[in-house]
Amino acid sequence: MKVILLKDVKGTGKKGEMKEVSDGYARNFLFPKKMAVQADSVAIKELNEKNKSKEIKAQKEYEEAVLLGKQMEEINIEIYSKAGEGGRLFGSITSKEIAEQLKKQKDIDVDKRKILLDEPIRSLGSTFVEIKIHQKVTTKIRVDVKEKQ
């Protein structure tokens, strides 16, 4: 019997997949627990429409991310911090501080986990920081660390 899974079922498949399962398994386990529906023409049509709308939504999100990435490449933020001899900072600039300054200076809200910083910035000067906007889109912004007077 062909069924469309409504939830992830261990050993059978993931949500939204159409699978061939035994009649007993479908009637006695999947249907009573509302884990699947029988794959008739109406259900198949509904599944195809959902998949199309998901693809359209994903494409739109990707295009918006590419546009935002191009805008963010031109961004330059300044962070002021106390520094000692040789331009070494007292403390360091973390992804959290960069996210806060992006929000404060440019009104762009970025999750600190999306800022890809190998290690915190510990010296004065310019650094290019990579930001992951979308799973397929990353961009770089310039962070200028200046000495606080």
Swiss-Prot record:
SUPFAM superfamilies the record matches: L9 N-domain-like, Ribosomal protein L9 C-domain
Annotated keywords: Ribonucleoprotein, Ribosomal protein, RNA-binding, rRNA-binding
Disulfide bonds: none
Gene Ontology cellular component terms for the protein in this record: ribonucleoprotein complex; ribosome
InterPro entries documented for this protein: Ribosomal_bL9, Ribosomal_bL9/RNase_H1_N, Ribosomal_bL9_bac/chp, Ribosomal_bL9_C, Ribosomal_bL9_C_sf, Ribosomal_bL9_N, Ribosomal_bL9_N_sf
Signal peptide: none
GO MF assignments: rRNA binding; structural constituent of ribosome
BP GO terms, sorted: translation
This protein's record includes keyword Ribosomal protein: yes
Function of the molecule: Binds to the 23S rRNA.
Family note: Belongs to the bacterial ribosomal protein bL9 family.
Stated name of the protein: Large ribosomal subunit protein bL9
Organism taxonomic ancestry: Bacteria, Bacillati, Bacillota, Clostridia, Peptostreptococcales
UniProt gene name: rplI
